[in-house]
A protein has these predicted regions:
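Soluble metallo-hydrolase cores and metallopeptidase-like ectodomains found primarily
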Residues: 1-56, 69-72, 76
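Acidic/histidine-rich catalytic neighborhood of metal-dependent amide-processing enzymes
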Residues: 24, 50-103
Length: 103
């Protein structure tokens, strides 16, 4: 198969998963410390959970990718910021914004 967009077979696969899962809230974060006002902070965040396959790619896979890319670019040693920037990824947004509330 030379078509990179074609699936290896025509069968549809489904993931059996609950839309809501009980358990602890989790988050991942890193902080770029500001040069002149380190105690003042911007938050750049997104949630890691999603519902469905295609929908989750945008809600919020695209946001997660953006936060990670911003963290990568702004972490370069030659990039300085006046204020600190915290890059945060949390879960349980799809169950009522619980991850962000817990943060």
């Amino acid at each position: 198969n030379t078509d990179s967009l074609r699936q290896p077979d025509a069968r549809l696969r489904a993931l059996n998963a609950e839309a809501s899962t009980a358990g602890p809230r989790q988050l991942v974060y890193c902080t770029k410390v500001g040069a002149t006002r380190p105690d003042e902070m911007y938050l750049v965040g997104a949630h890691m959970d999603g519902i469905g396959w295609g929908e989750a790619a945008n809600d919020d896979g695209s946001g997660t990718a953006l936060v990670m890319e911003l963290a990568r670019v702004l972490s370069a040693p030659d990039v300085t910021t006046e204020r600190s920037i915290r890059f945060v990824l949390w879960n349980n947004e799809e169950t009522g914004l619980n991850g962000a509330r817990a943060y």
